[in-house]
Protein backbone atom coordinates (compact mmCIF):
# COMPACT_ATOMS: atom_id res chain seq x y z
CA UNK A 1 0.00 0.00 0.00
CA UNK A 2 1.50 3.30 -1.05
CA UNK A 3 1.88 5.99 1.57
CA UNK A 4 -0.65 8.72 0.83
CA UNK A 5 1.42 11.75 1.85
CA UNK A 6 4.65 12.59 0.11
CA UNK A 7 5.97 14.93 2.74
CA UNK A 8 5.15 15.46 6.43
CA UNK A 9 2.53 18.11 6.95
CA UNK A 10 3.67 21.59 7.86
CA UNK A 11 1.43 22.37 10.79
CA UNK A 12 0.85 25.64 12.55
CA UNK A 13 -1.61 27.00 15.05
CA UNK A 14 -2.28 30.46 16.38
CA UNK A 15 -1.54 31.02 20.04
CA UNK A 16 -1.90 28.65 22.95
CA UNK A 17 -4.32 28.52 25.81
CA UNK A 18 -2.08 27.44 28.62
CA UNK A 19 1.24 25.79 29.32
CA UNK A 20 1.32 22.04 29.70
CA UNK A 21 3.10 22.21 33.03
CA UNK A 22 0.24 24.31 34.39
CA UNK A 23 -2.38 21.96 32.98
CA UNK A 24 -0.88 18.91 34.73
CA UNK A 25 -1.92 20.24 38.13
CA UNK A 26 -5.31 21.14 36.68
CA UNK A 27 -8.26 20.88 39.02
CA UNK A 28 -10.66 18.75 36.95
CA UNK A 29 -13.68 20.83 37.84
CA UNK A 30 -11.96 23.90 36.39
CA UNK A 31 -11.78 22.24 32.99
CA UNK A 32 -15.37 23.26 32.39
CA UNK A 33 -14.78 26.91 33.17
CA UNK A 34 -14.32 29.58 30.52
CA UNK A 35 -10.76 29.37 29.12
CA UNK A 36 -8.44 32.23 29.87
CA UNK A 37 -5.10 33.22 28.45
CA UNK A 38 -2.19 32.12 30.60
CA UNK A 39 1.49 32.84 30.33
CA UNK A 40 3.48 30.01 28.75
CA UNK A 41 6.36 28.95 30.97
CA UNK A 42 8.89 27.24 28.73
CA UNK A 43 11.77 26.78 31.18
CA UNK A 44 12.02 26.21 34.89
CA UNK A 45 15.12 26.06 36.99
CA UNK A 46 15.79 22.69 38.56
CA UNK A 47 17.67 24.15 41.52
CA UNK A 48 14.53 25.30 43.36
CA UNK A 49 14.44 22.04 45.35
CA UNK A 50 17.12 20.03 47.03
CA UNK A 51 17.97 16.75 45.37
CA UNK A 52 18.00 15.19 48.84
CA UNK A 53 14.19 15.32 48.75
CA UNK A 54 14.27 12.39 46.35
CA UNK A 55 15.20 10.05 49.18
CA UNK A 56 12.70 11.32 51.76
CA UNK A 57 9.22 9.93 51.34
CA UNK A 58 6.76 10.50 48.55
CA UNK A 59 7.98 13.19 46.17
CA UNK A 60 5.58 15.74 44.77
CA UNK A 61 5.67 16.30 41.02
CA UNK A 62 6.44 19.98 41.42
CA UNK A 63 9.41 19.06 43.63
CA UNK A 64 10.94 17.26 40.68
CA UNK A 65 10.19 20.29 38.51
CA UNK A 66 9.25 19.14 35.07
CA UNK A 67 11.63 21.02 32.81
CA UNK A 68 10.48 21.83 29.29
CA UNK A 69 13.72 21.85 27.34
CA UNK A 70 14.20 23.95 24.26
CA UNK A 71 15.35 21.87 21.25
CA UNK A 72 18.34 24.13 20.86
CA UNK A 73 19.41 23.93 24.47
CA UNK A 74 21.14 20.58 24.03
CA UNK A 75 23.91 19.51 21.73
CA UNK A 76 22.80 17.45 18.76
CA UNK A 77 26.12 15.69 18.31
CA UNK A 78 26.24 11.92 18.48
CA UNK A 79 27.81 11.79 21.95
CA UNK A 80 24.78 11.19 24.19
CA UNK A 81 24.12 13.39 27.19
CA UNK A 82 24.02 10.34 29.42
CA UNK A 83 27.72 9.85 28.60
CA UNK A 84 28.77 13.50 28.73
CA UNK A 85 27.03 14.29 32.03
CA UNK A 86 28.41 11.39 34.03
CA UNK A 87 31.87 11.45 35.57
CA UNK A 88 32.32 7.70 35.19
CA UNK A 89 29.79 6.45 32.66
CA UNK A 90 29.23 2.74 32.53
CA UNK A 91 30.71 1.33 29.30
CA UNK A 92 27.27 -0.10 28.50
CA UNK A 93 25.85 3.39 27.94
CA UNK A 94 27.88 4.27 24.85
CA UNK A 95 27.34 0.82 23.37
CA UNK A 96 23.61 1.07 24.07
CA UNK A 97 23.42 4.36 22.17
CA UNK A 98 25.29 2.83 19.26
CA UNK A 99 22.86 -0.10 19.17
CA UNK A 100 19.85 2.21 19.47
CA UNK A 101 20.99 4.34 16.53
CA UNK A 102 21.53 1.18 14.47
CA UNK A 103 17.86 0.34 14.91
CA UNK A 104 16.59 3.64 13.46
CA UNK A 105 14.17 3.45 10.52
CA UNK A 106 14.08 6.12 7.81
CA UNK A 107 11.25 7.14 5.49
CA UNK A 108 12.27 9.39 2.61
CA UNK A 109 15.44 10.35 4.41
CA UNK A 110 13.79 11.22 7.73
CA UNK A 111 13.96 9.06 10.90
CA UNK A 112 10.47 7.82 11.83
CA UNK A 113 11.11 5.19 14.50
CA UNK A 114 13.17 2.20 15.61
CA UNK A 115 12.68 -1.45 14.67
CA UNK A 116 11.74 -3.94 17.37
CA UNK A 117 14.99 -5.92 17.18
CA UNK A 118 18.25 -5.80 15.25
CA UNK A 119 19.03 -9.51 15.53
CA UNK A 120 20.63 -10.64 12.28
CA UNK A 121 21.58 -13.96 13.84
CA UNK A 122 17.93 -14.96 14.08
CA UNK A 123 16.73 -17.19 11.26
CA UNK A 124 13.16 -15.87 11.32
CA UNK A 125 12.61 -12.12 11.24
CA UNK A 126 8.82 -12.40 11.70
CA UNK A 127 7.64 -8.87 12.54
CA UNK A 128 10.68 -7.78 14.55
CA UNK A 129 11.81 -5.60 11.64
CA UNK A 130 8.79 -3.33 12.11
CA UNK A 131 8.29 -0.15 14.15
CA UNK A 132 5.87 -0.94 16.98
CA UNK A 133 4.07 1.93 18.68
CA UNK A 134 4.46 0.55 22.20
CA UNK A 135 8.05 -0.57 21.57
CA UNK A 136 9.08 2.86 20.32
CA UNK A 137 8.00 4.67 23.52
CA UNK A 138 11.24 4.04 25.50
CA UNK A 139 13.28 4.83 22.36
CA UNK A 140 11.38 8.09 21.98
CA UNK A 141 11.97 9.01 25.62
CA UNK A 142 15.69 8.29 25.23
CA UNK A 143 15.92 10.59 22.20
CA UNK A 144 13.91 13.32 23.95
CA UNK A 145 16.10 13.14 27.05
CA UNK A 146 19.14 13.40 24.80
CA UNK A 147 17.82 16.53 23.08
CA UNK A 148 16.90 14.82 19.79
CA UNK A 149 13.15 15.41 19.33
CA UNK A 150 12.96 15.23 15.52
CA UNK A 151 12.57 11.46 15.30
CA UNK A 152 9.77 11.61 17.89
CA UNK A 153 7.93 14.36 16.03
CA UNK A 154 8.25 12.45 12.75
CA UNK A 155 6.93 9.29 14.41
CA UNK A 156 3.93 11.11 15.90
CA UNK A 157 3.03 12.66 12.55
CA UNK A 158 3.55 9.46 10.57
CA UNK A 159 1.40 7.31 12.87
CA UNK A 160 -1.21 10.08 12.84
CA UNK A 161 -1.37 9.79 9.06
CA UNK A 162 -1.69 6.00 9.34
CA UNK A 163 -4.61 6.43 11.74
CA UNK A 164 -6.56 7.94 8.84
CA UNK A 165 -6.24 4.81 6.70
CA UNK A 166 -9.23 2.52 6.22
CA UNK A 167 -8.73 -0.49 8.48
CA UNK A 168 -10.29 -3.88 7.78
CA UNK A 169 -10.02 -7.40 9.17
CA UNK A 170 -11.63 -9.69 6.62
CA UNK A 171 -14.92 -7.93 5.85
CA UNK A 172 -15.13 -5.94 9.08
CA UNK A 173 -14.12 -2.29 9.24
CA UNK A 174 -12.31 -1.13 12.38
CA UNK A 175 -13.02 2.12 14.19
CA UNK A 176 -11.63 5.28 12.65
CA UNK A 177 -9.56 6.15 15.72
CA UNK A 178 -7.60 2.88 15.95
CA UNK A 179 -3.86 3.48 15.88
CA UNK A 180 -1.58 0.91 14.19
CA UNK A 181 0.16 -1.73 16.22
CA UNK A 182 3.17 -1.34 13.94
CA UNK A 183 4.36 -0.26 10.53
CA UNK A 184 7.14 -1.26 8.16
CA UNK A 185 9.07 0.86 5.67
CA UNK A 186 9.85 -0.85 2.36
CA UNK A 187 12.71 0.63 0.32
CA UNK A 188 12.75 0.09 -3.46
CA UNK A 189 16.35 0.77 -4.59
CA UNK A 190 15.39 0.52 -8.28
CA UNK A 191 12.51 2.99 -8.26
CA UNK A 192 14.07 4.87 -5.34
CA UNK A 193 10.77 4.98 -3.48
CA UNK A 194 9.74 4.30 0.11
CA UNK A 195 6.45 2.61 0.98
CA UNK A 196 4.83 2.11 4.37
CA UNK A 197 2.79 -0.96 5.30
CA UNK A 198 0.81 -0.69 8.54
CA UNK A 199 -0.66 -3.42 10.75
CA UNK A 200 -3.79 -2.59 12.76
CA UNK A 201 -4.18 -6.10 14.13
CA UNK A 202 -5.13 -7.87 10.91
CA UNK A 203 -1.71 -9.56 10.81
CA UNK A 204 -1.23 -10.00 14.55
CA UNK A 205 -1.40 -13.35 16.33
CA UNK A 206 -5.07 -13.74 17.20
CA UNK A 207 -6.06 -10.77 15.01
CA UNK A 208 -6.56 -8.44 17.97
CA UNK A 209 -6.47 -4.65 17.56
CA UNK A 210 -3.92 -2.87 19.80
CA UNK A 211 -5.95 -1.05 22.44
CA UNK A 212 -2.81 0.40 24.03
CA UNK A 213 -1.37 2.00 20.86
CA UNK A 214 -3.69 5.01 20.95
CA UNK A 215 -3.03 5.58 24.64
CA UNK A 216 0.75 5.41 24.17
CA UNK A 217 0.45 7.86 21.27
CA UNK A 218 -1.32 10.44 23.45
CA UNK A 219 1.16 9.90 26.31
CA UNK A 220 4.09 10.30 23.92
CA UNK A 221 2.61 13.47 22.41
CA UNK A 222 2.52 14.99 25.87
CA UNK A 223 6.08 13.79 26.58
CA UNK A 224 7.27 15.49 23.38
CA UNK A 225 5.48 18.70 24.34
CA UNK A 226 6.87 18.67 27.88
CA UNK A 227 10.41 17.97 26.70
CA UNK A 228 10.59 20.55 23.91
CA UNK A 229 8.26 23.23 25.22
CA UNK A 230 6.74 23.21 21.72
CA UNK A 231 2.97 23.49 22.08
CA UNK A 232 2.33 23.97 18.37
CA UNK A 233 2.38 20.26 17.47
CA UNK A 234 -0.25 19.15 19.97
CA UNK A 235 -2.43 22.16 19.10
CA UNK A 236 -2.56 21.47 15.35
CA UNK A 237 -5.99 20.53 13.98
CA UNK A 238 -4.56 17.15 12.92
CA UNK A 239 -3.31 16.20 16.41
CA UNK A 240 -6.45 17.54 18.07
CA UNK A 241 -8.56 15.42 15.73
CA UNK A 242 -6.33 12.38 16.29
CA UNK A 243 -6.83 12.62 20.05
CA UNK A 244 -10.58 13.04 19.68
CA UNK A 245 -10.80 9.97 17.43
CA UNK A 246 -8.92 7.85 19.98
CA UNK A 247 -11.09 9.14 22.80
CA UNK A 248 -14.27 8.51 20.80
CA UNK A 249 -13.47 4.79 20.81
CA UNK A 250 -13.16 4.53 24.58
CA UNK A 251 -15.66 7.17 25.77
CA UNK A 252 -18.59 5.96 23.68
CA UNK A 253 -21.74 4.91 25.52
CA UNK A 254 -22.74 1.25 25.57
CA UNK A 255 -23.87 -1.46 27.96
CA UNK A 256 -21.05 -0.87 30.43
CA UNK A 257 -21.85 -0.59 34.13
CA UNK A 258 -18.21 0.13 35.01
CA UNK A 259 -15.96 3.04 33.95
CA UNK A 260 -13.18 0.60 33.05
CA UNK A 261 -12.53 -0.56 29.47
CA UNK A 262 -13.62 -4.03 28.39
CA UNK A 263 -10.84 -5.68 26.35
CA UNK A 264 -9.97 -8.90 24.59
CA UNK A 265 -6.93 -11.05 25.36
CA UNK A 266 -3.79 -9.97 23.51
CA UNK A 267 -4.62 -6.27 23.11
CA UNK A 268 -1.55 -4.85 24.85
CA UNK A 269 2.03 -5.77 25.78
CA UNK A 270 0.70 -9.18 26.82
CA UNK A 271 -0.25 -9.86 23.20
CA UNK A 272 -1.07 -13.56 23.48
CA UNK A 273 -3.77 -15.48 25.30
CA UNK A 274 -2.95 -15.12 28.99
CA UNK A 275 -6.32 -14.75 30.71
CA UNK A 276 -6.21 -10.95 30.76
CA UNK A 277 -9.51 -10.51 28.90
CA UNK A 278 -12.02 -8.32 30.70
CA UNK A 279 -10.61 -5.28 32.49
CA UNK A 280 -6.80 -5.71 32.63
CA UNK A 281 -4.88 -3.36 34.92
CA UNK A 282 -2.38 -2.39 32.19
CA UNK A 283 -5.12 -1.03 29.92
CA UNK A 284 -6.97 0.72 32.75
CA UNK A 285 -3.79 2.46 33.96
CA UNK A 286 -2.84 3.54 30.42
CA UNK A 287 -6.44 4.65 29.79
CA UNK A 288 -6.37 6.79 32.93
CA UNK A 289 -3.01 8.32 32.02
CA UNK A 290 -4.05 8.99 28.42
CA UNK A 291 -7.23 10.71 29.61
CA UNK A 292 -5.23 13.00 31.88
CA UNK A 293 -2.69 13.74 29.15
CA UNK A 294 -5.45 14.49 26.65
CA UNK A 295 -7.16 16.76 29.17
CA UNK A 296 -4.00 18.85 29.35
CA UNK A 297 -3.70 19.14 25.56
CA UNK A 298 -7.24 19.36 24.17
CA UNK A 299 -8.40 22.83 23.21
CA UNK A 300 -11.63 23.96 24.88
CA UNK A 301 -13.12 24.90 21.52
CA UNK A 302 -16.47 23.82 20.10
CA UNK A 303 -15.29 20.28 19.34
CA UNK A 304 -12.98 19.84 22.30
CA UNK A 305 -15.28 21.09 25.03
CA UNK A 306 -17.59 18.07 24.87
CA UNK A 307 -14.62 15.71 25.16
CA UNK A 308 -13.23 17.67 28.11
CA UNK A 309 -16.55 17.30 29.95
CA UNK A 310 -16.66 13.57 29.25
CA UNK A 311 -13.03 13.10 30.32
CA UNK A 312 -13.63 14.91 33.61
CA UNK A 313 -16.60 12.70 34.46
CA UNK A 314 -14.82 9.52 33.41
CA UNK A 315 -11.68 10.31 35.40
CA UNK A 316 -13.66 10.76 38.61
CA UNK A 317 -15.54 7.50 38.09
CA UNK A 318 -12.46 5.57 36.96
CA UNK A 319 -10.25 6.70 39.84
CA UNK A 320 -12.91 5.76 42.40
CA UNK A 321 -13.53 2.38 40.79
CA UNK A 322 -9.86 1.42 40.52
CA UNK A 323 -8.89 2.61 43.99
CA UNK A 324 -11.90 0.88 45.54
CA UNK A 325 -12.14 -2.46 43.74
CA UNK A 326 -8.73 -3.18 42.17
CA UNK A 327 -6.63 -2.30 45.21
CA UNK A 328 -5.42 -5.17 47.38
CA UNK A 329 -3.47 -5.00 50.62
CA UNK A 330 -3.38 -7.16 53.73
CA UNK A 331 -6.56 -5.71 55.21
CA UNK A 332 -8.49 -5.87 51.94
CA UNK A 333 -7.35 -9.46 51.38
CA UNK A 334 -8.61 -10.36 54.83
CA UNK A 335 -11.92 -8.63 54.07
CA UNK A 336 -12.36 -10.55 50.80
CA UNK A 337 -11.51 -13.78 52.63
CA UNK A 338 -14.48 -13.10 54.94
CA UNK A 339 -16.89 -11.93 52.25
CA UNK A 340 -20.48 -13.05 52.16
CA UNK A 341 -21.72 -14.03 48.72
CA UNK A 342 -24.99 -13.72 46.80
CA UNK A 343 -25.67 -10.26 48.23
CA UNK A 344 -28.55 -8.55 46.45
CA UNK A 345 -29.04 -4.86 47.24
CA UNK A 346 -27.42 -1.47 46.94
CA UNK A 347 -25.81 -2.06 50.35
CA UNK A 348 -23.85 -5.10 49.17
CA UNK A 349 -20.19 -5.04 50.15
CA UNK A 350 -19.14 -7.90 47.86
CA UNK A 351 -20.37 -6.01 44.81
CA UNK A 352 -18.74 -8.32 42.27
CA UNK A 353 -19.80 -11.49 44.07
CA UNK A 354 -16.22 -12.71 44.37
CA UNK A 355 -16.10 -16.18 45.90
CA UNK A 356 -13.65 -16.33 48.84
CA UNK A 357 -12.80 -19.91 47.86
CA UNK A 358 -11.46 -18.57 44.54
CA UNK A 359 -8.59 -16.77 46.30
CA UNK A 360 -5.42 -18.65 45.27
CA UNK A 361 -3.28 -20.06 48.07
CA UNK A 362 -0.13 -18.25 46.95
CA UNK A 363 -1.52 -14.76 47.60
CA UNK A 364 -1.88 -15.35 51.36
CA UNK A 365 1.86 -15.94 51.70
CA UNK A 366 2.77 -13.31 49.09
CA UNK A 367 0.97 -10.37 50.74
CA UNK A 368 3.15 -8.61 53.36
CA UNK A 369 1.70 -6.71 56.31
CA UNK A 370 2.99 -3.51 54.71
CA UNK A 371 2.45 -3.19 51.01
CA UNK A 372 -0.20 -3.58 48.35
CA UNK A 373 -0.89 -3.51 44.62
CA UNK A 374 -3.57 -3.24 41.97
CA UNK A 375 -4.75 -6.73 41.04
CA UNK A 376 -4.70 -7.84 37.42
CA UNK A 377 -8.42 -7.85 36.69
CA UNK A 378 -11.83 -7.44 38.33
CA UNK A 379 -15.13 -8.46 36.75
CA UNK A 380 -18.31 -10.23 37.90
CA UNK A 381 -17.40 -13.21 40.13
CA UNK A 382 -13.79 -12.97 38.99
CA UNK A 383 -10.71 -11.38 40.52
CA UNK A 384 -7.29 -12.01 38.97
CA UNK A 385 -4.90 -11.70 41.91
CA UNK A 386 -1.75 -11.76 39.76
CA UNK A 387 0.72 -8.89 39.98
CA UNK A 388 1.35 -7.08 36.68
CA UNK A 389 4.38 -4.78 36.74
CA UNK A 390 3.56 -2.35 33.93
CA UNK A 391 0.04 -1.63 35.15
CA UNK A 392 1.21 -0.92 38.70
CA UNK A 393 4.12 1.29 37.62
CA UNK A 394 1.91 3.31 35.26
CA UNK A 395 -0.63 3.63 38.08
CA UNK A 396 2.05 5.42 40.10
CA UNK A 397 3.20 7.62 37.21
CA UNK A 398 -0.34 8.67 36.29
CA UNK A 399 -1.37 9.19 39.94
CA UNK A 400 -4.13 6.63 39.54
CA UNK A 401 -2.57 5.30 42.74
CA UNK A 402 -2.84 7.65 45.69
CA UNK A 403 0.42 8.65 47.42
CA UNK A 404 -0.22 6.02 50.11
CA UNK A 405 -0.96 3.36 47.52
CA UNK A 406 2.15 4.33 45.54
CA UNK A 407 4.30 3.88 48.63
CA UNK A 408 2.60 0.56 49.34
CA UNK A 409 3.46 -0.70 45.84
CA UNK A 410 7.10 0.23 46.47
CA UNK A 411 6.97 -1.50 49.86
CA UNK A 412 5.68 -4.65 48.18
CA UNK A 413 8.52 -4.54 45.64
CA UNK A 414 11.08 -4.33 48.43
CA UNK A 415 9.44 -7.07 50.50
CA UNK A 416 9.05 -9.39 47.52
CA UNK A 417 12.24 -8.52 45.64
CA UNK A 418 13.23 -12.14 45.02
CA UNK A 419 9.84 -12.95 43.52
CA UNK A 420 9.24 -9.79 41.45
CA UNK A 421 12.82 -8.92 40.45
CA UNK A 422 15.08 -11.86 41.21
CA UNK A 423 18.28 -11.81 39.16
CA UNK A 424 16.91 -9.76 36.24
CA UNK A 425 14.36 -6.92 36.39
CA UNK A 426 11.41 -7.15 36.00
CA UNK A 427 8.75 -9.86 36.16
CA UNK A 428 6.00 -8.96 33.70
CA UNK A 429 3.57 -10.76 35.99
CA UNK A 430 3.67 -12.92 39.10
CA UNK A 431 3.18 -15.78 39.63
CA UNK A 432 3.21 -17.91 36.51
CA UNK A 433 0.36 -20.24 35.62
CA UNK A 434 1.19 -23.89 35.07
CA UNK A 435 -0.12 -27.44 34.67
CA UNK A 436 -3.88 -27.73 34.10
CA UNK A 437 -4.45 -23.98 34.56
CA UNK A 438 -1.83 -23.25 31.88
CA UNK A 439 -3.58 -25.59 29.44
CA UNK A 440 -6.96 -23.96 30.04
CA UNK A 441 -5.88 -20.30 30.20
CA UNK A 442 -3.27 -20.18 27.42
CA UNK A 443 -4.63 -22.94 25.21
CA UNK A 444 -1.36 -24.87 25.65
CA UNK A 445 0.70 -21.97 24.27
CA UNK A 446 4.26 -23.32 23.77
CA UNK A 447 5.73 -19.81 24.05
CA UNK A 448 4.02 -18.95 27.34
CA UNK A 449 5.22 -21.93 29.35
CA UNK A 450 5.81 -21.38 33.06
CA UNK A 451 8.24 -18.59 33.97
CA UNK A 452 8.72 -17.71 30.31
CA UNK A 453 7.72 -14.84 28.03
CA UNK A 454 4.45 -13.29 29.26
CA UNK A 455 3.88 -16.08 31.77
CA UNK A 456 6.17 -14.86 34.52
CA UNK A 457 9.11 -13.98 32.28
CA UNK A 458 11.50 -11.14 33.16
CA UNK A 459 11.54 -8.15 30.78
CA UNK A 460 14.44 -5.66 30.94
CA UNK A 461 12.35 -2.98 29.18
CA UNK A 462 10.26 -2.63 32.34
CA UNK A 463 13.31 -1.12 34.06
CA UNK A 464 12.40 2.37 32.82
CA UNK A 465 8.87 2.28 34.27
CA UNK A 466 10.22 0.93 37.56
CA UNK A 467 12.89 3.65 37.71
CA UNK A 468 10.37 6.40 37.00
CA UNK A 469 8.05 5.06 39.71
CA UNK A 470 10.97 4.86 42.16
CA UNK A 471 11.97 8.46 41.51
CA UNK A 472 8.41 9.73 41.85
CA UNK A 473 7.98 7.97 45.20
CA UNK A 474 11.38 9.08 46.49
CA UNK A 475 12.89 5.58 46.41
CA UNK A 476 15.75 5.89 43.87
CA UNK A 477 17.79 3.28 45.75
CA UNK A 478 15.40 0.59 44.49
CA UNK A 479 16.05 1.66 40.90
CA UNK A 480 19.82 1.70 41.45
CA UNK A 481 19.68 -1.84 42.75
CA UNK A 482 17.73 -2.95 39.68
CA UNK A 483 20.10 -1.14 37.30
CA UNK A 484 23.07 -2.88 38.94
CA UNK A 485 21.47 -6.23 38.09
CA UNK A 486 20.87 -5.13 34.50
CA UNK A 487 24.45 -3.93 34.07
CA UNK A 488 25.84 -7.23 35.30
CA UNK A 489 24.34 -9.19 32.40
CA UNK A 490 22.29 -7.40 29.75
CA UNK A 491 25.14 -6.34 27.46
CA UNK A 492 26.99 -9.62 27.91
CA UNK A 493 23.83 -11.45 26.83
CA UNK A 494 23.44 -9.19 23.74
CA UNK A 495 20.40 -7.23 24.97
CA UNK A 496 17.78 -10.02 24.90
CA UNK A 497 14.05 -9.41 24.76
CA UNK A 498 13.23 -11.37 27.93
CA UNK A 499 14.62 -13.87 30.44
CA UNK A 500 13.18 -17.17 31.65
CA UNK A 501 13.11 -18.91 35.01
CA UNK A 502 11.70 -18.17 38.43
CA UNK A 503 14.64 -15.87 39.18
CA UNK A 504 15.01 -14.56 35.60
CA UNK A 505 18.36 -16.31 35.31
CA UNK A 506 18.23 -17.66 31.75
CA UNK A 507 18.00 -15.84 28.42
CA UNK A 508 14.51 -16.53 27.04
CA UNK A 509 14.24 -19.63 24.88
CA UNK A 510 12.78 -17.63 21.97
CA UNK A 511 14.09 -14.20 22.97
CA UNK A 512 15.43 -12.00 20.19
CA UNK A 513 18.87 -10.47 20.76
CA UNK A 514 19.53 -6.73 20.41
CA UNK A 515 15.92 -6.02 21.34
CA UNK A 516 15.53 -2.26 20.91
CA UNK A 517 13.27 -1.56 23.85
CA UNK A 518 15.56 -3.50 26.18
CA UNK A 519 18.35 -1.16 25.06
CA UNK A 520 16.24 2.00 25.25
CA UNK A 521 14.70 1.05 28.60
CA UNK A 522 18.17 0.86 30.13
CA UNK A 523 19.20 4.24 28.69
CA UNK A 524 16.02 5.96 29.90
CA UNK A 525 16.47 4.53 33.39
CA UNK A 526 20.09 5.73 33.55
CA UNK A 527 19.24 9.23 32.32
CA UNK A 528 16.34 9.62 34.75
CA UNK A 529 18.55 8.70 37.70
CA UNK A 530 21.21 11.18 36.54
CA UNK A 531 18.64 13.95 35.96
CA UNK A 532 15.36 13.28 37.81
CA UNK A 533 13.73 16.30 36.14
CA UNK A 534 13.24 14.03 33.10
CA UNK A 535 10.44 12.32 34.98
CA UNK A 536 8.21 15.28 34.15
CA UNK A 537 7.79 13.89 30.64
CA UNK A 538 6.00 10.78 31.81
CA UNK A 539 4.61 11.59 35.25
CA UNK A 540 1.49 13.41 36.40
CA UNK A 541 0.77 14.95 39.78
CA UNK A 542 -2.29 13.80 41.72
CA UNK A 543 -5.42 15.83 41.06
CA UNK A 544 -6.74 17.24 44.31
CA UNK A 545 -10.36 16.74 43.28
CA UNK A 546 -9.98 12.96 43.06
CA UNK A 547 -10.13 12.26 46.78
CA UNK A 548 -8.70 9.01 48.16
CA UNK A 549 -11.44 6.47 48.71
CA UNK A 550 -12.63 5.86 52.26
CA UNK A 551 -11.94 2.28 53.34
CA UNK A 552 -15.01 0.07 53.15
CA UNK A 553 -16.05 -2.11 56.06
CA UNK A 554 -15.71 -5.86 55.76
CA UNK A 555 -18.61 -8.18 55.01
CA UNK A 556 -18.69 -10.07 58.28
CA UNK A 557 -19.77 -13.69 58.41
CA UNK A 558 -20.61 -13.77 62.11
Swiss-Prot record:
GO MF term list: beta-fructofuranosidase activity; endo-alpha-N-acetylgalactosaminidase activity
Q: Which reaction does it catalyse?
A: Hydrolysis of terminal non-reducing beta-D-fructofuranoside residues in beta-D-fructofuranosides
Q: What is its main location?
A: cytoplasm
Native organism taxonomy: Eukaryota, Viridiplantae, Streptophyta, Embryophyta, Tracheophyta
Family, as annotated: Belongs to the glycosyl hydrolase 100 family.
Superkingdom of source: Eukaryota
Record's function text? Cytosolic invertase that may cleave sucrose into glucose and fructose, and that is involved in the regulation of root growth. May regulate sugar-mediated root development by controlling sucrose catabolism in root cells.
| Protein name in the entry | Alkaline/neutral invertase CINV2
PANTHER family on file: ALKALINE_NEUTRAL INVERTASE CINV2, PTHR31916
Q: Which GO terms describe its cellular component?
A: cytosol
| Protein's cellular compartments | Cytoplasm, Cytosol
Q: Which residues carry this modification: Phosphoserine?
A: 16, 19, 50, 555
Q: Which residues carry this modification: Phosphothreonine?
A: 79
> What broad class of enzyme is this?
hydrolase
- EC number, as in UniProt: 3.2.1.26
What does the record list as GO biological process? root development; sucrose catabolic process
Keywords on record = Carbohydrate metabolism, Cytoplasm, Glycosidase, Hydrolase, Phosphoprotein
